């Protein structure tokens, strides 16, 4: 009869772009992959592996970084567009461990989901659950982070690498980042945010959005107990957040904006925004 699915075993698979040392270079490799294609949906390829994966890439400072991925379960779906090009990728990891020079130390996660869609605008959605952060970074609110989420749409042609030429071209073509949902739940602190951002003529972030915070009073107390801020600064920060934001039970909502090199929370200037830096500058 007509097969419901066609399985294939792949001993080793390697994907990448450019040559090692070139801007935009990256490589990903995995072994012992099971791939399944369903004739009724030939544009979708389901993949799964329990073997470790490795990756290397050139970062924004033109330095080669490595990343090793170990997971109890690693599944993914690759979608091929009608033109034969890669259209979308989604992955799911369980009991995930990350190590390598791309990180300051080992990172563990109970689960990680990621998806990216390349059709027209680029849509990205990444969420990590029950993360254990590396001790090397001296985590502010402990080593355990409950949720880390970023869901965004990037308009304009995606830059091929982190260089002034590529990023300028993206900006000049009207490139924007629309953060539809960002979330960090870390200790008592629970922050969600959304906004739309771009780059100004001097390569500084510009845009606006809204952030909502819960557990901020408790988190300020933790920072004070760890001597990371003084009691006086803690009192000023607590009062400032409550004055600038709109109270809704235990939630504070804060409008923020980035313009002319200044980050403002409400009408108050909170930080100076510097231009982006590129390799060789």
Predicted regions and their residues:
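A beta-strand-loop signature enriched in Asp, Gly, Thr, and Trp
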Residues: 176-180, 190-207
